[in-house]
């Protein structure tokens, strides 16, 4: 049974952590990986240790922790405090804007922030609003955390302001998607490949400089800082030399394996159906209207579920008879 609230801010509550079974891709259990991640956060200043349970006052709301197991990520289940938050709508850039943003004969680069939410520090007087408990200790967040529904808007507004500044004052074309950005050769000038390469490299160097001044860290492993003709951004392979979009082989294989698994089982959970529909629609730029036609039945089922016409969100749905 749910609980009703009639107040302007969340009452104090303590929730238990929700650890998934199994091991992460690093070979650790969820609590082990989470504890290591929390210790790293304390070391960087993104998380603050309050003290041991029973020796210090807990945060106003003790939120449950969980771990995304595939690509290990610490998740703060902030659904409780999110009920009292009202983030504004915003629109993210997409791969579909590449043709209108970058020159057709230009090269491309991209960078990806590392722990980007940690660039947004919380005022010390507000850090006790919510936190968590692990291994008998209370912690609060000293910077942004994954799970609080206000963070995407804050992140988007701040990062796009940086990119727009670079576009206005340095003429650097770019697109941004939360912690990920794409840049390319500058407009103007001739079509000399050497000059196109030089301008693209200069552009990404300026963007990196601005990011460091703004307090962001960049993941070298996830970034492509050397200008190139072929680059994968937001799951789509962009061929700037041929002016074409492609589906990366790994992504194509992942979707095919998912579809074959569903076919063999004969049914699918609602959560997996939502994920499958999203994955297929993300291929729209490369396969065109076929993505909409293929997923039409998926979205029809999801709409009927939301209207209460069929099943519940916990039931499995049969797509094959």
Regions found by a protein language model. Name each.
Residues 77, 112-114, 147, 169-193, ...:
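Catalytic palm active-site di-aspartate
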Residues 1-26:
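Non-catalytic, polymerase-adjacent accessory regions of viral genome-replication enzymes
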Residues 106, 115-118, 217-242, 284:
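Short, conserved secondary-structure transition motifs
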Residues 21-157, 246, 250-299, 306:
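Catalytic-core region of right-hand nucleic acid polymerases
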Residues 294-321:
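Conserved, charged catalytic cores of large soluble enzymes
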Residues 152-207:
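Active-site palm subdomain of RNA-directed nucleic acid polymerases
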Residues 64-65, 71-74, 105-109, 172-175, ...:
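Beta-sheet entry/capping signal
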Residues 190-213, 241-254:
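Helical (often loop-to-helix) elements that flank the catalytic cores of nucleotide-handling enzymes
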């Amino acid at each position: 049974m749910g609980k009703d609230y009639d107040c302007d801010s969340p009452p104090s509550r303590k929730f238990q952590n929700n650890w998934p079974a199994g091991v992460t891709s690093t070979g650790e259990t969820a609590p082990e990986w989470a504890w290591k991640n929390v210790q790293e956060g304390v070391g960087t200043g993104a998380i603050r240790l309050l003290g041991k349970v029973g020796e210090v006052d807990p945060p106003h709301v003790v939120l449950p922790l969980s771990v995304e197991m595939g690509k290990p990520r610490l998740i703060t289940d902030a659904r409780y405090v999110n009920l009292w938050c009202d983030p504004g709508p915003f629109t993210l850039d997409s791969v579909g804007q590449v043709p209108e943003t970058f020159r057709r004969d230009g090269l491309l680069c991209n960078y990806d922030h590392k722990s980007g939410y940690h660039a947004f520090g919380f005022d010390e007087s507000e850090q006790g609003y919510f936190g968590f408990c692990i291994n008998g200790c209370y912690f609060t967040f000293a910077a942004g955390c994954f799970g609080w529904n206000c963070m995407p808007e804050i992140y988007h507004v701040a990062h796009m302001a940086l990119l727009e500044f670079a576009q206005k004052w340095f003429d650097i074309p770019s697109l941004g998607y939360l912690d990920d950005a794409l840049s390319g050769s500058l407009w103007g000038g001739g079509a000399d490949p050497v000059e196109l390469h030089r301008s693209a490299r200069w552009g990404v160097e300026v963007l990196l400089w601005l990011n460091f001044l703004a307090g962001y860290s960049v993941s070298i492993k996830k970034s492509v800082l050397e200008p190139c003709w072929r680059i994968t951004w937001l799951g789509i392979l962009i061929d700037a030399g041929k002016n074409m979009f492609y589906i990366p082989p790994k992504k194509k294989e992942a979707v095919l394996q998912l579809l074959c698994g569903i076919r063999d089982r004969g049914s699918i959970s609602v959560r997996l159906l939502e994920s499958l529909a999203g994955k297929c629609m993300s291929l729209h730029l490369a396969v065109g209207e076929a993505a909409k036609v293929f997923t039409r039945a998926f979205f029809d089922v999801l709409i009927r579920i939301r209207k209460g016409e069929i099943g519940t969100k916990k039931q499995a749905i049969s797509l094959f008879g």
